[in-house]
Every structure is written in C-alpha cells, then in structure tokens.
Amino acid sequence: ENGLALEHDISNVKHFAQRGIVYITLCHNGDNDICDSARGCNTHNGVSSFGEKVIQEMNRLGIMVDLSHGGEKSFYDALDISQTPIVCSHSSSRALCDVPRNLTDDQMRALAAKGGVAHTTLYHGFLRTQGEATIIDAISHLEHAIDVMGIDHVGIGTDFDGDGGVR
C-alpha cells in the first residue's frame, strides 16, 4: 500500500512484479510522486507525469492499479490512463458515509464502465461517520455499490491489516 515504495524509479515496478506483487495502491494518506491522495494537498492536480509512466508499466507487466486512497482527480486520471481495469481494494460509498476516501456514485459507475471493481472496506471510519460501525453498515455499503455498479463490479476489501473490522 503506497507506490512510494517505488522510490521514483520506474524499474522498481518490474522488480516488484518479479517478486509476485499483483497490485499496487498508488498512494496512501498523502500525496506522493505518483498521484494526489484523498487526504493530500493536490500537489499534481491528479496523476503526475511519473505516475502516468508507472500506470503504463503496471499495465505492461500485468500489475493491477489500485486507487483506494486516491483523490478524485487521481481516480479519473488513472481510469483514463490505464488500459486495463482498475480496482479500489478498500473503498466504501460516499453516499452513505461522506468522507473523501470513499467513492462517489459517479466514480463507481465510471469504474464499472471500464470493467473495474470496488471492494467495500470494513474499516469503521469509512462505513459511518458517527457511532460504532456494524456488519449492517457494511452490508448497506455493499448493497448500495451493487445497486450502482452491478454485482460483477463489487467485492469486499476488509482492510484488517489497516485497522478494519466491524461488530
């Protein structure tokens, strides 16, 4: 999680591919040299020129582009740049929980139109803004995503390694 591990060296995409990496989350909780984060400062106004090369190399090597944590402009830029479907490995619905990390309905529709998948996260702060998140909240996000995108474009991305979990 976070393309910062590429260390601004495009050859590291191949390095990681050769070691079995199947997807790279382009950014995390802040802008990096690849793209702007949902919690960033809009450093590049979306995907940077280096980020465009990274996405193209990921496509060439069969590594999935993951836009969880990406800012909205980064999301649409990556969707335009990528020649393969992208994923959002742990992103919920902004219509149900209004935080910048979650996907708008328009983003969900655009992702589905390009063959991508949005995985609803079980991280409590992205399921509800107040109170304790429950499995019912997670199901509501899944049902909403299915209604917007169709079931073929919806998955579950628990984020258990990033403090995910509901009661």
Model-derived segments and spans:
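Extended, charged catalytic domains and RNA/DNA-binding interfaces, predominantly
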Residues: E1-G131, A138-I146, H153
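Short acidic/histidine-rich active-site segments
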Residues: T121-L122, M149-R167
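Outer-membrane beta-barrel pore domains
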Residues: T129-I135, G164-R167
